[in-house]
Curated annotation (Swiss-Prot):
Gene3D superfamilies: 2.70.98.90. Pfam families: 60KD_IMP, YidC_periplas. This is Membrane protein insertase YidC. GO terms for cellular component: plasma membrane. The chain crosses the membrane at residues 9-29, 375-395, 449-469, 507-527, 546-566.
Length: 609
């Protein structure tokens, strides 16, 4: 009876895990989509109908003018960007930051592969850039620089972490514009714009900043990850607009103080970080010219009236780079990973990394893995060590759980007697059983608690592996070169001995891409199942026989780091449960149960005549 209850509970928990995963990846996205549509409709209704003045709009080069990235860079005068993590240039035409490579990150695990391209100039296939400046008040005739204005560099030399650059433009009508750009040793640009009025009358200008991206980017397509426009906008808090969502809304505006906004990918982002005291008219928008869509995050600050002989100025910042947790920052109690979030006094800038709804578990999971990575120098080993710690933390609960189940085994004679007394009265039987459990201080469902508590651990580790750049291209040993990617080996081509890729087979490909680690995980799960006697109920037996096979196929496409965790967790569970069983005087039947499987298979073979 005890083993039947335990097996039933485990089956329920595993089935619940599958249902939770289904809810997490399929049902919730639809609910979120409906909620987002309502939110967009509400936001549009309360947004100002017309910013004053109009926000800058993206330029749309003719389709025939599209050129290669290198050609576009070479045909405009530029100031070089050269820092330990960034390489690129500032276009003097428009004074845009539109050429940026992340030199510490490569497109593939091959260190000789190209560096990640973040920004690309207008005229290429996928322009992506940041622009800053001034907008004249409605009705004003003041001529301000735009995307076609050619600026001049004061002095010479590249923009480095120790040498800012200053650009200048004189409109010939009494207004002189200067822009000083500095960059730190990570991904933060600081931009100071000044305008001096030597004309004959005061002039009113609005400071602006924008990030513009042409073309709809390829996204991962997973609900657990946001890719698109993002911002933490004062009292309106975190705002996330996928490309599809902003296509439907067209434009949404927000009046905010102490906000930031930008565009985020899975691992990279560009974000505008205005002064925390600035009053902003922030906006997300989607525009279309021909077949090309343009996505833009921008803001206008309050107007500045510059008197004759006076100077107006504004400061802003641009984050453009990798979403490294230590650089962006982590807002979590008792943790000193402040990054830009703390350094600049920003409002929840750590949410640029999509920690998810269960951030209170995901963040500690990442911090633990990151700590042990710095101890061992390998994220795979860090995963193994953190799993051991989790097992140690849950050990008292697991011990009490199995002790309770041992008591259940001790009262089985009483339960059997009750079944004989009440063969047809199920309600009375349950009442009497509960009385026995209460008297003996037995919790009949305690056996599933350790497994239930593992579910949030599983999902938090999956989230960390999937969204954090620290896990990207992080190797383990042997053939695992990237813990955030699925195991690259395939059993159906004999792990590379046969010259074809099973995952490329039409329709069946995703089901044939089963690597070595998913198989190891399935074997460890099978041993864990065999730690308990075979259930007498045929349905339970069928579920438990097929569960390791099902999970092997399910986890084959998951990150290798997660599969390694599950396999290691199964192994530790077998060791831990065997220890607890012996400690409670229960015989460990693992080897006998395994042998019985093969004995049954042998006995099923037809006898030789």
């Amino acid at each position: 009876m005890m083993s039947e209850n335990r097996n039933t509970i485990i089956a329920i928990v595993l089935s619940g895990l599958i249902l939770i995963a289904w809810q997490y990846f399929y049902n919730i996205p639809q609910m979120e989509k409906d909620r987002a549509a309502q939110q967009a409709q509400s936001q549009t209704a309360k947004s100002p109908t017309e910013p004053t003045p109009n926000s800058p709009k993206p330029d749309h080069p003719a389709a025939e003018s599209v050129v290669a990235r290198g050609v576009a860079i070479a045909t405009t005068p530029r100031v070089k960007i050269d820092t330990p993590r960034l390489s690129g240039s500032i276009s003097l035409k428009g004074a845009r930051i539109d050429d940026l490579l992340l030199t510490k990150f490569r497109e593939t695990v091959d260190p000789a592969s190209p560096a990640i391209e973040l920004f690309s100039p207008s005229g290429t296939t996928t322009p992506y850039y940041a622009e800053f400046g001034w907008v004249a008040a409605t009705g004003s005739t003041a001529r301000v620089p735009d995307q076609n204005t050619v600026w001049q560099q004061e002095g010479s030399g590249a923009l480095t972490q120790s040498t800012p650059v200053t650009l200048k433009y004189d409109n010939g009508e009494g207004l002189t514009f200067r822009r000083t750009i500095a960059v730190d040793d990570h991904y933060l640009f600081t931009i100071k714009d000044e305008v001096t009025n030597a004309g004959g009358a005061p002039v009113t200008l609005y400071p602006f900043a924008l990030i513009s991206r042409h073309g709809t980017p390829a996204v991962s397509g997973y609900y657990i990850l946001h890719e698109g426009l993002i911002g933490y906008l004062g009292d309106q808090k975190l705002q996330e607009y996928s490309y599809k969502k902003i296509d439907e809304a067209k434009s949404v505006s927000f009046k905010v103080t102490n906000g930031w906004l930008g565009i985020t990918d899975k691992y990279w982002a560009a974000a505008l970080l205005p002064d925390t005291s600035a009053q902003l008219q922030a906006r997300f928008s989607s525009n279309e010219s021909g077949s090309v869509k343009t996505y833009q995050a921008d803001y206008l600050e309050d107007a500045q009236t510059i008197p004759v002989g006076g100077t107006g100025s504004v400061n802003t910042r641009l984050f453009a780079g990798a979403k490294e947790a230590g650089v962006v920052g982590i807002n979590f109690p008792f943790v000193e990973l402040g990054g830009y979030n703390k350094q600049l006094g920003l409002n929840h800038f750590d949410l640029l990394i999509d920690w998810g709804w269960f951030y209170f578990i995901t963040k500690p999971m990442f911090l633990a893995l990151d700590f042990f990575f710095h101890v061992f120098g390998n994220f795979g080993i860090a995963i193994l060590f953190v799993t051991v710690l989790i097992k140690a933390i849950f050990f008292p609960l697991a011990n009490r759980s199995y002790a309770s189940m041992a008591k259940m085994k001790a009262v089985q004679p009483q339960i059997a007697a009750l079944k004989e007394r009440f063969p047809d009265d199920k309600m009375k039987l349950q009442q009497e059983m509960m009385e026995i459990y209460k008297k003996e201080k037995i919790n009949p469902i305690s056996g599933c608690l350790p497994m239930v508590l593992q579910i949030p651990v599983f999902f938090s580790l999956y989230k960390v592996l999937f969204v954090t750049i620290e896990m990207r291209h992080a190797p383990f040993f042997a053939w695992i070169k990237d813990l955030s990617a699925p195991d690259p080996t395939h059993i159906f081509n004999l792990f590379g001995l046969l010259p074809y890729d099973p995952s490329a087979v039409p329709l069946l490909g995703p089901y044939l891409a089963i690597g070595a680690w998913p198989i190891i995980m399935g074997i460890t799960m099978w041993f864990q199942m065999k730690l308990n006697p075979t259930p007498p109920d045929p349905t339970q037996k069928l579920i438990f026989d097929w569960m390791p096979v099902i999970f092997t196929f399910m986890l084959a496409a998951f990150p290798a780091g997660l599969v390694i965790y599950w396999a290691w967790n199964n192994t530790l569970s077998v060791i831990q449960q065997s220890y607890i069983m012996r400690r409670n005087g229960v015989k460990v039947e693992l080897l006998n149960n395994v042998k019985s499987v093969f004995r049954r298979k042998s006995s099923d073979k037809p006898a030789k005549t």
